[in-house]
C-alpha cells in the first residue's frame, strides 16, 4: 500500500458534482453541548475547497461515540454539530435525521448548488461497523445483504467520495471502504497524514530516530519490530523500559511495571537491533514513587542502584534526559509514539516535557518531527507545541497500525494515482 500514490482532493474536478465526504466529527459532548470543536474545525478546509470550487453539494457523514448499531439520538446525535458547522462555515447546514434510506436519498439527489448536508450518526446502523450490541448487552451482527444495501444507499448520496477521517482509517467500516463510486480521494487532513507517514515509512531522511514509550512491551512488539527495519536509532522509554532493564541488566525494579509476556521477547528484539545495526538507548536514571498516586513520596534511582522494594519508577531522571538529547541532536527525522513518564502528574512529567523541548528544538533546526496520536498528541496539547513540531497525527490507533507496518483499509480503498 503506497501512501504517497493516492488520489487527493486537490486533484479532483468537483465542479457541479455532489461530494460525499467521510469526516471525523467524533467530538466530546456534555448534555448535547460540544465541549471541544477541534475536529469540526479541522474538516473546514476540505469542505470549503469543495464549495469554493463549485461543488453542487457536500454531504458529510461521521460517527459519534459508540451507540453500537442502535439509534440513540438522545445521547449520540450529530445534530449539535450542524449548528457548530453553520457558525464555522457561515452558511446553512441541512441536518438529516438518518444517514441512509429513501428520504435521505431524496434529500441528496437534487440539491441546490452549494448545499451542505450533515447526515445522522452512521453507527445508529449496525451495518456501519458490521457488529454491535443492543441496550441489554446482546450481541448484534449485521447480515451481508443488509450491509450491501447500507453501502449502496450511502453511495447514492454523491458522485465523488472524499475521505478525511484518518482516525478511523484502520477500521474496515462501511463508510470507510464500502462507498462504490469511481473516484475516491483523500481530503486535506488525510492527505497531510499520508504525506508525513510516507516521509517516515517510504523514504526516510537519515539518521532516523524512533522514540517509543508507553507501558507494555507486549502492546508495542509489532511496532518495535517494524521500526527496527526502518530506523538508525531507537529510544525505548516509559513503563516498558523496566521490562528491558530487568531482563538485560538484571536491574532491581521494585514495584515498577514488569510485562511477563513482553519479557520473553526482549532478547529477540535486541538480536534484531544488533543485526540491523540499530542502536537502542534506554533510561539510566529514574524518578520513583512509593505508590501509584499523584501525591506519592518522590525518590531517585539509577540502573546501578536499582529501585527499592515497594517503590516504582514513574519517570526518567536528569541523566537520561541528557542522554536522550544527545541522540536527538543527530537526527534528521524523529517519530515519537508514547510518553516516557506519567506526564499527567507534575512530579513525573519532567522527562516527557524535556523530550518535548528537544523535539521542538530539533524541529526548529529543520528535523522532521512526527508525533503519533493518542497520549503523545495529548502531550502536545498540554504543552502547547502542536504548531512547533512538523506533524501531530490525529489518529492514535491508525498511526500506530501504520507504524506497525499494517495496511489501513480506509487508505487502501482510495483510488490510486
UniProtKB/Swiss-Prot annotation:
Its cofactor is Mg(2+). The modification N-acetylserine is found at residue 2. Keywords: Acetylation, ATP-binding, Cytoplasm, Glycolysis, Kinase, Magnesium, Metal-binding, Nucleotide-binding, Phosphoprotein, Transferase. This is Phosphoglycerate kinase 2. CDP binds at residues 214, 219, 238, 338, 340, 343. GO terms for molecular function: ADP binding; ATP binding; metal ion binding; phosphoglycerate kinase activity. Essential for sperm motility and male fertility but is not required for the completion of spermatogenesis. The lineage of its organism: Eukaryota, Metazoa, Chordata, Craniata, Vertebrata. The modification Phosphotyrosine is found at residue 196. The gene is PGK2. Belongs to the phosphoglycerate kinase family. GO terms for cellular component: cytosol; sperm fibrous sheath. Pathway: Carbohydrate degradation; glycolysis; pyruvate from D-glyceraldehyde 3-phosphate: step 2/5. Its EC number is 2.7.2.3. The modification N6-acetyllysine is found at residues 11, 48, 75, 86, 97, 131, 146, 199, 267, 291. It comes from Equus caballus. Mg(2+) binds at residues 215, 218-219, 375. It is found in: Cytoplasm. The modification Phosphoserine is found at residues 2, 4.
Amino acid at each position: 500500500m503506497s501512501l504517497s500514490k493516492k488520489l487527493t482532493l486537490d486533484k479532483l474536478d468537483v465542479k457541479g458534482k455532489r461530494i460525499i465526504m467521510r469526516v471525523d466529527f467524533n467530538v466530546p459532548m456534555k448534555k448535547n453541548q460540544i465541549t471541544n470543536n477541534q475536529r469540526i474545525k479541522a474538516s473546514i478546509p476540505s469542505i470549503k475547497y469543495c464549495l469554493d470550487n463549485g461543488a453542487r453539494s457536500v454531504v458529510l457523514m461521521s460517527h459519534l461515540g459508540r451507540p453500537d448499531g442502535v439509534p440513540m439520538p438522545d445521547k449520540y446525535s450529530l445534530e449539535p454539530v450542524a449548528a457548530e458547522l453553520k457558525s464555522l462555515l457561515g452558511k446553512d447546514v441541512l441536518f438529516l435525521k438518518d444517514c441512509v434510506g429513501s428520504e435521505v436519498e431524496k434529500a441528496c439527489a437534487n440539491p441546490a448548488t452549494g448545499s451542505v448536508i450533515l447526515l445522522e450518526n452512521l453507527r445508529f446502523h449496525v451495518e456501519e461497523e458490521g457488529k454491535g450490541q443492543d441496550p441489554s448487552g446482546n450481541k448484534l451482527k449485521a447480515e451481508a445483504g443488509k450491509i450491501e444495501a447500507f453501502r449502496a444507499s450511502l453511495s447514492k448520496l454523491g458522485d465523488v467520495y472524499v475521505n478525511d477521517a484518518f482516525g478511523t482509517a484502520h477500521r474496515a467500516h462501511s463508510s470507510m471502504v464500502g462507498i462504490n463510486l469511481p473516484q475516491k480521494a483523500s481530503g486535506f487532513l488525510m492527505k497531510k497524514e499520508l504525506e508525513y507517514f510516507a516521509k517516515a515509512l517510504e523514504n526516510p531522511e537519515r539518521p532516523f530516530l524512533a522514540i517509543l514509550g508507553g507501558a507494555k512491551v507486549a502492546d508495542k512488539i509489532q511496532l518495535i519490530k517494524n521500526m527496527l527495519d526502518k530506523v538508525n536509532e531507537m529510544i525505548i522509554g516509559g513503563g516498558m523500559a523496566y521490562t528491558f532493564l530487568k531482563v538485560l541488566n538484571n536491574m532491581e525494579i521494585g514495584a515498577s511495571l514488569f510485562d511477563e509476556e513482553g519479557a520473553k521477547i526482549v532478547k529477540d528484539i535486541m538480536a534484531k537491533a544488533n543485526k540491523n545495526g540499530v542502536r537502542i538507548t534506554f533510561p539510566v536514571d529514574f524518578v520513583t514513587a512509593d505508590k501509584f498516586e499523584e501525591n506519592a513520596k518522590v525518590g531517585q534511582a539509577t540502573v546501578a542502584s536499582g529501585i527499592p522494594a515497594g517503590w516504582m519508577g514513574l519517570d526518567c531522571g536528569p541523566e537520561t534526559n541528557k542522554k536522550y538529547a544527545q541522540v536527538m541532536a543527530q537526527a534528521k527525522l524523529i517519530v515519537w509514539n508514547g510518553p516516557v513518564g506519567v506526564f499527567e502528574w507534575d512530579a513525573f512529567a519532567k522527562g516527557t516535557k524535556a523530550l518535548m523541548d528537544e523535539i521542538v528544538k530539533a524541529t526548529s533546526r529543520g528535523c522532521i518531527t512526527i508525533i503519533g496520536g493518542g497520549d503523545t498528541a495529548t502531550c502536545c496539547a498540554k504543552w502547547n507545541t502542536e504548531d512547533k513540531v512538523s506533524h501531530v497525527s490525529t489518529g492514535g490507533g491508525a498511526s500506530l497500525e501504520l507504524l506497525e507496518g499494517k495496511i489501513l483499509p480506509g487508505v487502501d480503498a482510495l483510488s490510486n494515482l
